[in-house]
Design a protein with these regions (language model features):
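Short beta-strand/loop motif that positions the catalytic acidic residue
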Residues: 150-151, 156-158, 162
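Short alpha-helix in the alpha/beta-hydrolase fold that links the catalytic acid
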Residues: 165-175
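Serine-hydrolase catalytic machinery in alpha/beta-hydrolase-like enzymes
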Residues: 15-104
């Protein structure tokens, strides 16, 4: 497994900081995963423990993994845009990863995120995306989530005691979503302290089961 820094360029001309962790040479490449971090106005960046655990784990399961800082975070250019411009940031990450995967083998590109990053990722619906992985998404009943009616697969990981969107509230929001799996992390709240490695394993297992199934 190798790790490199990278620069993403958004369609509106911003340069974003990123890291890429590639699949070890002795592991078959399955595809790639984008990881979007929690809310930048509350200290979120690409080094958050949940994001970092996924960044370390997923390459061992066959997925090149990219984490990045949203616009206005650390050395990424621009300023926070309340989720709108940040969708362009995720799209730039998908564009970057498309050069790492083999389209002829139908390698997959998944959009993943935690908290704010999950909510942003769920509204990036471009054709190159294979599906979505949303960890503790802070969804509300009036949220307009672009992927909700999309037939591509979705994994929603929700902490049992999430302060913003607990399992029962999530069910009321996503009850009519297509092709959606839900996984509850017992004894965890929104911040998932002590549960980051468990979350990473759940994501890796879900992706592996999709391939084997």
């Amino acid at each position: 497994m190798s790790r490199d820094t990278a620069t993403l360029v958004t369609i509106d001309g911003l340069h974003l900081e990123a890291d890429v962790s590639t699949v070890p040479t002795d592991v078959e490449v399955r595809g790639a995963v984008v990881l979007a971090h929690p809310h930048p106005l509350y200290g979120g960046d690409r080094f958050h423990p949940v994001v970092s655990s996924l960044f370390e784990h997923l390459p061992t399961r066959g997925y090149h993994t990219l984490r990045f800082d949203f616009r206005g975070v650390n050395a990424s250019e621009g300023r926070h845009d309340d989720g709108d411009g940040e969708r362009l940031d995720v799209a730039a990450a998908v564009d970057f990863l498309s050069y790492l995967v083999d389209a002829e083998r139908d390698d997959e590109i998944w959009v993943g995120g935690y908290s704010f990053g999950a909510a942003v990722g769920l509204s990036v619906v471009e054709p190159r995306v294979s599906g979505w992985i949303a960890i503790a998404p802070p969804l509300t009943s009036d949220a307009r989530v672009l992927c909700s009616g999309d037939p591509r697969p979705k994994l929603l990981i929700v902490p049992q005691h999430d302060q913003f969107c607990p399992p029962d509230r999530l069910d009321s929001v996503v009850g009519d979503w297509k092709n959606t799996d839900r996984s509850v992390v017992a004894m965890a709240d929104h911040f998932l302290n002590g549960h980051a490695d468990d979350v990473a394993r759940r994501v890796g297992d879900w992706l592996a089961n999709r391939v084997s199934g």
